[in-house]
Amino acid sequence: MSKAHQAIQVDSPHPLDPLSSSELTLAVIIILQHAQLDSRALFEQVRLKEPEKLSVQQFLAGHSIEREAFAVVLDRNADKVYEAIVRLNDATLQSYTWVPGVRVCMLAEESAELQEIVKQHPDFIAGLKRRGIENIQQVHVEAFAVANLAEPDEQHLRHTRAHCFYVENPGDNTYARPVEGLVPVVDLNAMTVLRVEDSGVVPLPPDPGDYRADRLEVRPALAALNITQPDGPDFKVDGYAVHWQNWKFRIGFTPKEGLVLHTLSFRDGETDRPVIYRASLSELVVPYGDTAGDHYMNHSFDLGETIFGAQVNSLRLGCDCLGEIHYFDFDQVDGHGNVQHFSKIVCMHEEDYGTLWKHTDVASDHSEIRRSRRLVVSSFFTIGNYDYGLFWYLYLDGTIEFEAKLTGTLYLRAIHEGEETPYGALVAPGVNGMVHEHYFNIRLDMSIDGDDNTVVEVEAERIPAGSENPYGNAHTSKETIISSEINGARDLAPENGRFWKIINRSSTNTLGWHAGYKLMPGPNIKPMHQPDSPFMRRAGFVNHDLWVTAYDSNQLHAPGQYVSHNEGGPGLPEWIQENRPLIDTDVVIWHTIGVLHLPRPEDFPVMPVEYVGFTLKPVGFFERNPTLDLAPPICHI
């Protein structure tokens, strides 16, 4: 162990508070001093090393805590990846460990370097001239992961294949006019061009794909729709802690996952009852279905191959968020170890959500109604051509909802006039919108009235015709306890209304119900790729809609921690082989949501939002409707 620099004094932060700017700076300094890295070294991430659950649950405000930073560092000269843990209270390097056989994500700093070296390469310049492009500044070069499809003599290299786009005028749609067939291959560690592949000239698509308001004729503005709360919002914020109605939770943000929710609890009477310990995006992967050129390689892991959280948007009032808004800022470290302040990257506000419940009693001619309101916590991320909104909704009745909003621009392939597009669709002259999918995996570390939980699969069951079903209408429900990890890979069965309950068998209400929540999936798909395809070897988690594992603080990502260039490393399919018991223990559920995107002309030049998600609803958690005490609205005739 090594000591360096001055220890940092933190004013009694909560154990889950993200690292401050000074903490991040200290962590970087300590690592650099110990490892003697030169200026070419890169920091993939530096984040809070979250304490063990017990220390979080027993934390008392004002007490001192041990603060630790976790970092992933790339020594580009040696092509070695290291994990570091820094104790911030006494400025000590706890560990600095080489992790053999893995590669880090590609970083924004490398993308900028890559642009410069590719544009100076004579073979690239010559390839552009063959396509009639003389001005190198009219070309955007974007790196794409090679996945597990590298050439045999390049498998030892950390490298990338770049795709190019013609941007005739500043501000044009970057992705509307692909420069097809010209592919620079770049060694990222050495930052040199290995070669420039040219499979032949395809005409540049003619349509610039304008979508900016300053370049189009727009209709008159919509009539004003003002959202006001004269008395202010109902939520209270203390640092990263939020209290809204009966909900309490904490906001977090990490470089890879982006938005994280911690320690969600619901106040029932005089008790704050835990529901979820940690909720986060585990992975987002986008495989394409076109076999042309090198597009068959495209299946980007947006967390595993890029730094998802670093590509977050700064949100704007009136555009991204409406109403009485509270924003959260976070600090992150860039690839060179410099602290960057990210402003307004998490937005929180309330929304009216229509009717919560209503009944008109005809006999007494009396009507009761309550209006629903939800708390919205959201972030938006831009990963190349795609934009993703991650939204968490909390409702007055204890419901939790996750929603992903998919928008941005299509990733396109230029085609010859009259060329057939069996693996996509013609969305504009000369461009094929390639068929693809999006797979989200959400990690939910459940904590229903504590950590000892059990997952139960529930579905409807028809009773066979006979003495027990004389009228043919009888059906009941069937419950199956998921007892061990080997049985923890589960699939939807919409024909039977299948869902999953997470229950605490030691917490029972007066009706005999175990306290629980049920996961209600939304629309979903099965993988389109062949089981033995390169993509499926790396993304085995997409094979099942739900996975259940025993809690392990090191298992945060469905395909494993290090995805870049791997053939298919540790991840959910491997973890469940441990066959750990799952009854009355600390369990994690992982929900995979798949979206099939068959592009259409209406997706060009920019895509209207597609919505996907799931819902968690209390089941037996309360003894009756928990919103009976909600004040009625003021009604007007």
Residue ranges and their predicted role:
Residues 15-57, 107-150:
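Short, non-transmembrane alpha-helical segments in secretory-pathway proteins
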Residues 1-16:
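Generic start-of-chain signal for non-secretory N-termini
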